[in-house]
């Protein structure tokens, strides 16, 4: 059932036809309202007519009309109509919140123009609203008018009495509805005038204590007092829309062509354009933030666990467990002692293999954050490319024979200033306490023959970049000792003919990257160019297929690793590379692509140089988001759901604003003269004839069957004419007056009501009616008016 596609949230309103419920679509996540209409007592023809009309209305596309998504008839006898949700509520409630404080004229005319444009669109489509009132005019959160409940009451209003089902209380009913005339588009203009009067005065244009008095006031033709705090043009426009004779009321099209309205449309148009351009700027800025949001989310939700795994006599390696981690640029990394080798002696190679499998899906991901440009100026001297090593502090040069305790002391000294680029590898404190011994991390692959693996030597210090803030910690995989020995042997052979490098500069806190042969390497950077322009940028670098094959041959993969590897390749490879690196960054990688593993240290340096020398275009960010793994997306979903929803809604509102701007521009271009259609409908003889274009016009009163065109036979013949309701009202009123006064006294009262002198008339009425004057004088006057002006 279509109803199952929505998640019900709460009831937002109830009416005479049913209730309105706020729902959320399970698939697209958008909010809608479902209006449930009770059709249990309606005939099958009436139900079909209501549903067909709802489907017709769902095709209307206008920025000032509530969108209709779908409708269906449930098995419970209810008609369900799904409409767009307006966060600002209805206009009636908005006016009540004013608490007597009048709105500025610009706001009144702004809403007035939007309602008028919606009515003009409906009238051009030959659709009458028939139930225009402030309760059916809604506001979005950007203060845009949405006219709703279009034509739904046409079928339903014929059941029950007029006071409860016609339009609730008929504050907006035009005088012709109480006579032998059908509903016409000029009745919509009357209702529009009532709405504008209510917006200007915060009161109903016609009000009374009871239904009979209200009908009498409307038919009497006595205009309410016009608002004095507004311009005479607005007051005159309201007065013409509330003219008793329909032919004297202007059409909606002519209203929008008046100079007074055009002037306000121009002002509103300029304000809307400015708001739209401002929203566009915000949307452009928000597009540069999703990657940074992912980084900050991971910083809050994830933790690193670093284990020191004892090696064989040939050396030791670093093993890292956990998910991909990204650390914020603002927060320093807490550096604590590592677990001592003695605490991990019980770990076996099999366990290491399992741990490797657990992190295999993300072992190829490198995350790098680049410091904004304002901090580069003071650190440009420290930015060193791989081909140009420069000076480093003597404290950063590590003696090959230094002890573990010396390294620990130097590490603790650097911890005190986490903002300095000399920080070493970041580590979380473990349960072992501060008293446990710790060692610096050494890389899996030495970069030249001068630096040989030694258990007491730290070789994990990479190129120093003073401009780089403490950055994200890339993920390194678990490796078996046998695998490490194989890799070190390969590295010794590889580095035998490579260039020598006597020094290594220290890198801000981050872990060494793993062998980048499996899948993709994501580089997330926050940097600014020399022109102080920049934002979160990101790139995805695919490793070559050859190096991927070489990595698979290094060691046998477990079943879990193979599953993760296959899943990672299926997810990553189709997206393709999103960034083209500069030639300077590609050239150092060429020797390693020929069936040789890439040194982690050199690869990291190449990535750093690439990011420093190459500014990624902003339009590449969208492609980056497709390259993120499921692990990254799942870890950041909760933090980005709302922003994505806001962005989606913001885009929808921006489109609506653009449509509104285009519509107002077209409205300003309307000609000043009446069209042929307007001239034809102003003919009094055809004013209330059931026009052939108005297929959904409701015949409220009279015998017009011979005038109905053939295509109007769609209207249900079982509909009770509106005159039947009025006739019942008059009958009830007549019975009440006759019972209270009697026929003879009622005839005398009718004669006295024809007296021209008001004072003499009232005196004689009091004399004849006595104590009944207060109760029956007004009722007798209403009964006389109905019998003289309303024909049945």
UniProtKB/Swiss-Prot annotation:
Ranges of Basic and acidic residues composition bias in the record: 641-657
InterPro entries linked: Kinase-like_dom_sf, NEK_Ser/Thr_kinase_NIMA, Prot_kinase_dom, Protein_kinase_ATP_BS, Ser/Thr_kinase_AS
Keyword Cell cycle (UniProt): yes
Modified residues (N6-methyllysine): 566
A Pfam family that the UniProt record links to this protein: Pkinase
Regions that span the bilayer: none
Annotated GO CC locations: cilium; cytoplasm
GO biological process entries: cell division; DNA damage response; mitotic cell cycle; protein phosphorylation; regulation of cellular senescence
Residue numbers binding ATP: 12-20, 35
SUPFAM superfamilies hit by this protein: Protein kinase-like (PK-like)
Function in brief: Required for normal entry into proliferative arrest after a limited number of cell divisions, also called replicative senescence. Required for normal cell cycle arrest in response to double-stranded DNA damage. Protein kinase that seems to act exclusively upon threonine residues.
Family affiliation: Belongs to the protein kinase superfamily. NEK Ser/Thr protein kinase family. NIMA subfamily.
Full protein name: Serine/threonine-protein kinase Nek4
Record gene name: Nek4
């Amino acid at each position: 059932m279509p109803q199952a596609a929505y998640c019900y949230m709460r009831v937002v309103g109830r009416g005479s036809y049913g209730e309105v419920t706020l729902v959320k679509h399970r698939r697209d996540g958008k909010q809608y309202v479902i209006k449930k209409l009770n059709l249990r007592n309606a005939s099958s023809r009436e139900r079909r007519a209501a549903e067909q009309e709802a489907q017709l209305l769902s095709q209307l596309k206008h920025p000032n009309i509530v969108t209709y998504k779908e409708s269906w008839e449930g098995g419970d006898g209810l008609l369900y109509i799904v409409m767009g949700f307006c966060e600002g509520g209805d206009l009636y409630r908005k006016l009540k919140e004013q608490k007597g404080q009048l709105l500025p004229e610009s706001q009144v005319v702004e809403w007035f123009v939007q309602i008028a444009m919606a009515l003009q669109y409906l009238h051009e489509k030959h659709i009458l609203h028939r139930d225009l009132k402030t309760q059916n005019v809604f506001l979005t959160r950007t203060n845009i008018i949405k006219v709703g409940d279009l034509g739904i009451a046409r079928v339903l209003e014929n059941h029950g009495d007029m006071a409860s089902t016609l339009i609730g209380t008929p504050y907006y009913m035009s005088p012709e509805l109480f006579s032998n005339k059908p509903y016409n588009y000029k009745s919509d203009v009357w209702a529009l005038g009532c709405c504008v009067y209510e917006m200007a005065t915060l009161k109903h244009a016609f009000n009374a204590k009871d239904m009979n008095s209200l009908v009498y006031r409307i038919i009497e033709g006595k205009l309410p007092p016009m608002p004095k705090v507004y311009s005479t043009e607005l007051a005159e426009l309201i007065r013409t829309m509330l003219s008793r004779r329909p032919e004297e009321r202007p059409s909606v099209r002519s209203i929008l062509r008046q100079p007074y309205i055009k002037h306000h449309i121009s002002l509103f148009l300029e304000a809307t354009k400015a708001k739209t351009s401002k929203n566009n700027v915000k949307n452009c800025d928000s597009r540069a933030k999703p990657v940074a949001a992912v980084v900050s989310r991971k910083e809050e939700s994830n933790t690193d666990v670093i284990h020191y795994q004892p090696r064989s006599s040939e050396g030791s390696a670093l093993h890292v467990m956990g998910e991909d981690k990204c650390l914020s640029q603002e927060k320093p990394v807490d550096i604590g002692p590592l677990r001592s080798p003695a605490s991990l002696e019980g770990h076996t190679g099999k366990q290491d293999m399992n741990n490797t499998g657990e992190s295999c899906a993300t072992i190829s991901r490198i995350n790098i954050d680049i410091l904004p440009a304002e901090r580069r100026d003071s650190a440009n001297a420290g930015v060193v490319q791989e081909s140009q090593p420069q000076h480093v502090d003597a404290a950063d040069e590590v003696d090959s024979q230094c002890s573990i305790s010396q390294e620990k002391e130097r590490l603790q000294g650097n911890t005190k200033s986490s903002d300095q680029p000399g920080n070493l590898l970041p580590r979380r404190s473990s349960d072992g306490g501060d008293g446990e011994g710790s060692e610096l991390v050494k890389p899996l692959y030495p970069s030249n023959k001068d630096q040989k693996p030694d258990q007491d030597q730290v070789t994990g210090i990479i190129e120093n970049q003073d401009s780089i803030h403490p950055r994200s910690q890339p993920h390194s995989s678990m490796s078996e000792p046998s695998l490490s020995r194989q890799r070190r042997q390969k590295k010794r052979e590889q580095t035998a003919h490579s260039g020598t490098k006597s020094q290594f500069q220290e890198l801000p806190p981050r872990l060494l990257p793993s062998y980048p042969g499996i899948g993709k390497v994501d580089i997330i950077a926050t940097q600014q160019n020399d022109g102080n322009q920049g934002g979160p940028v990101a790139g995805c670098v695919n490793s070559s297929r050859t190096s991927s094959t070489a990595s698979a041959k290094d060691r046998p993969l477990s079943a879990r690793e193979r599953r993760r590897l296959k899943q990672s390749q299926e997810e990553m490879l189709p997206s393709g590379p999103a960034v083209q690196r500069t030639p300077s960054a590609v050239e150092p990688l060429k020797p390693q692509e020929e069936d040789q593993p890439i040194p982690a240290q050199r690869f990291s340096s190449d990535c750093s140089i690439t990011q420093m020398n190459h500014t990624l275009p902003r339009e590449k960010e969208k492609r980056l988001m497709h390259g993120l793994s499921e692990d990254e997306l799942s870890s950041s979903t909760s933090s980005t759901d709302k922003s994505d929803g806001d962005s989606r809604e913001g885009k929808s509102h921006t489109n609506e604003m653009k449509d509104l701007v285009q519509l107002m521009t077209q409205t300003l271009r309307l000609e000043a003269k009446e069209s042929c259609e307007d001239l034809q409908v102003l003919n009094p003889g055809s004013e209330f004839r059931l026009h052939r274009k108005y297929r959904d016009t409701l015949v409220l009163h009279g015998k017009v069957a011979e005038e109905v065109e053939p295509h109007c036979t769609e209207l249900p013949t079982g509909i009770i004419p509106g005159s039947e309701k009025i006739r019942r009202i008059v009958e009830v009123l007549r019975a009440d007056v006759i019972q209270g006064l009697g026929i003879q006294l009622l005839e005398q009262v009718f004669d006295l009501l024809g007296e021209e002198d008001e004072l003499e008339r009232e005196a004689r009425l009091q004399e004849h009616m006595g104590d009944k004057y207060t109760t029956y004088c007004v009722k007798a006057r209403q009964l006389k008016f109905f019998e003289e002006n309303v024909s049945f």
